Amino acid sequence: MRASCTPLKAPLRRPERLASSGRFAWVLLLAPLLLLPTSSDACDDPPRFVSMKPQGTLKPSYSPGEQIVYECHLGFQPVTPGQVLALVCQDNNTWSSLQEGCKKRRCPTLADPTNGQVILVNGSTEFGSEVHYVCNNGYYLLGTNISYCEVSSGTGVNWSDNPPTCEKILCQPPPEIQNGKYTNSHKDVFEYNEVVTYSCDPSNGPDEYSLVGESKLTCIGNGEWSSQPPQCKVVKCVYPAIEHGTIVSGFGPKYYYKATVVLKCNEGFNLYGNSVVVCGENSTWEPELPKCIKGHPPRPTDASPPNGAEGLGAGYIVLVIVAVLIGVGLLLCLYCCFCRQRKKGIYVTGESHRQDILFSL
């Protein structure tokens, strides 16, 4: 008994696949055609201008023969008064030509303030420009120092602020001080750069008054003096005695403000500190008095480096030693080479039993 099996075959679907691929190919071929510009009977968007804008609201499209009327922006005015500024959509779907038809308005010309000056930052008074105000020496500015040309009521332009004024710089009398006075104390007001000088009164006691601080004050601003007033007080320092030392210069029975003394130590003692001291405003020596100590002198703290080879110190000595060693080494090498060459120049021949000495140059 025989059994035969016939293999089953899958149904063929190639025609359907080919049809699907064909449709996709047609889509790819037709897609670029959809992107091609189509002819239209309308003009594109109208051009933009810096000084002008369209009147009203723009339409989505304009047909040939239609026009757009322009007007000036705020702060601008027509170059030619009465001229109609318009664009026309032409038959070829392009706009007619139109130039900028407006220009910037100008603010009123400003005069220099009394005792001052107005500076045109942009070199003109056109819309959007600015000016700066400055006062002459001895005067201060009252008001706003910068003004801008901007849109005012309606379509006009004007300056943003009123012009300032330049007022004379004056100072009130400077402060009075105890035990002292200043010049021109009878005046109620002082002008710019005017100077007053302070001085101390005579003392009723055994010690005189010292003027501590600036003796001259200058009116530098509106109600402002150059510095604080000085003081008149007794400034007296004690006798600058140091153990194992003496005064070199600046001797005096009393030592008042800014008295200067030079000190030195006795033989065998060294000075630690400053040799020159000054009587300060707090009745103390500045800097403090030095000390004289027996023994070796103190190390210099701020000695300047000497000039020449001495300033090089140990580094210079090391360089000299290295240079000498290198020189000796070179001489030894030359000597060894010379001896080796002499040995190469002597040889013996077996035929004549002679020694020929050859000298190599």
Curated annotation (Swiss-Prot):
The chain crosses the membrane at residues 312-332. It comes from the Eukaryota. Residues 1-42 form the signal peptide. The keyword Electron transport does not apply. GO terms for biological process: complement activation, classical pathway; innate immune response; negative regulation of complement activation, classical pathway; single fertilization; T cell mediated immunity. This is Membrane cofactor protein. Sushi domains 3 and 4 are the most important for interaction with C3b and C4b. The lineage of its organism: Eukaryota, Metazoa, Chordata, Craniata, Vertebrata. Interacts with C3b. Interacts with C4b. Interacts with moesin/MSN. Disulfide bonds join C107-C149, C135-C166, C171-C219, C200-C232, C237-C279, C265-C292. The gene is CD46. N-glycosylated. Residues 333-361 are cytoplasmic. InterPro entries: CD46, Sushi/SCR/CCP_sf, Sushi_SCR_CCP_dom. Residues 43-311 are extracellular. GO terms for cellular component: cell surface; extracellular space; inner acrosomal membrane; plasma membrane. Keywords: Complement pathway, Cytoplasmic vesicle, Disulfide bond, Fertilization, Glycoprotein, Immunity, Innate immunity, Membrane, Phosphoprotein, Repeat, Signal, Sushi, Transmembrane, Transmembrane helix. Residues 43-104, 105-168, 169-234, 235-294 form the Sushi domain. Acts as a cofactor for complement factor I, a serine protease which protects autologous cells against complement-mediated injury by cleaving C3b and C4b deposited on host tissue. May be involved in the fusion of the spermatozoa with the oocyte during fertilization. May act as a costimulatory factor for T-cells which induces the differentiation of CD4+ into T-regulatory 1 cells. T-regulatory 1 cells suppress immune responses by secreting interleukin-10, and therefore are thought to prevent autoimmunity. It is found in: Cytoplasmic vesicle, Secretory vesicle, Acrosome inner membrane. The keyword Nucleus does not apply. Coiled coil: none annotated. Gene3D superfamilies: Complement Module, domain 1.
